[in-house]
């Protein structure tokens, strides 16, 4: 079987400090769900994924990694601050493998929600047909498609369906499988799943990078959160986790959670590799400052990276078309801030970057619901202003201009500077022509 080539590339990183401030959008101590006529507290409900629809509604996933998680997918009510099962409580029924069993990753675009169902409940073996991608129409709340993954694509004993990005240009979904075994004595079997969304009458999916070294957890790496070791007896072993698709849909970035490495793949090469068994080059895109969970690419060619070891959020700016060099910037205000413990998933809405901080490393047994170690709240949604930036699904918009007075002034000054520069060039050129003419005249006089 033809394997992916792994190319090591030397990349220069520049750490810069950004003064971009962050703000608390909402924080809560215990997750509260709102059902038909009553509210209920859930101490085993940990928020993980977060996304926005076009109307600004907030959707949050609560994977059923523990008992009594009443709903695995919910809509956040910004007025009551309660979570409402979405699209309904019935669709969140974990006793039915056809319903939403355990959701972590999902994506929203153009009125459609793509929900990735892990199928794994409280560490048990997933039921038949429970590992799937479910597609809903937001407005009607109707399910429009269901893609059930067969064993050769997602092995129930190992599959841990984690993150998802949508390639709207090719109508494909890329899904990270962290490959965490049910039996922790076994080795991880992570990989990447490519799902064809065009085919609706049957599953059309391919698994690549199966147990490739770049998707495996780093066996020598022991994760620390705010300098505190995660798991005392054995290191946390999680393979490929966060994935991000570039705004031109040409490059897929990924990183194992138990690692500080960042990798990328050219999409066309990867698809050609699948079709003709040709070589596909994995690019080592750099050594990150710390381990990451969520990744997110933006319309302005920024790669946003969570830093779970310290609570930082990083921005990797692509400054070369061939992705051989990246420029890192850092939100200074997040450094060492315990309130951002374990930033999990990223989302962009209304020129703001949002993320959930959920203390995954402490959940659920070391969570203090009476006196949270992170302050007043155990869980938080933060945001930071990211002017002129948007979701990768909107496509690249590198030349986008915000026509505010300040930016107009900058562009006017820039245009004037260009005109002045060109005038000097023209003047210099004219002078040079005069000198040449004079020299030619002198030569003519000497000859005659």
PLM features: residue spans?
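Short loop/turn segments immediately following beta-strands, especially the blade-tip
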Residues: 139, 196-203, 265-275, 316-324, ...
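Conserved beta-strand positions in repeat-built beta-propeller and related beta-rich domains
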Residues: 60-66, 115-119, 124, 174-184, ...
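Beta-strand-rich domains and repeat architectures in extracellular enzymes and scaffolds
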Residues: 29-71
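Surface-exposed loop and turn segments in beta-propeller and other repeat-based domains
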Residues: 25-40, 82-98, 144-156, 202-233, ...
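Beta-propeller blade signature
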Residues: 72-78, 129-140, 188-198, 370-389
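Blade-level signature of beta-propeller repeat domains, shared across WD40, Kelch, NHL, RCC1
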Residues: 345-403
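Extracellular juxtamembrane-to-transmembrane boundary of type I single-pass membrane glycoproteins
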Residues: 399-414
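Beta-rich, blade/repeat-based domains predominating
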Residues: 41-54, 94-111, 116, 151-176, ...
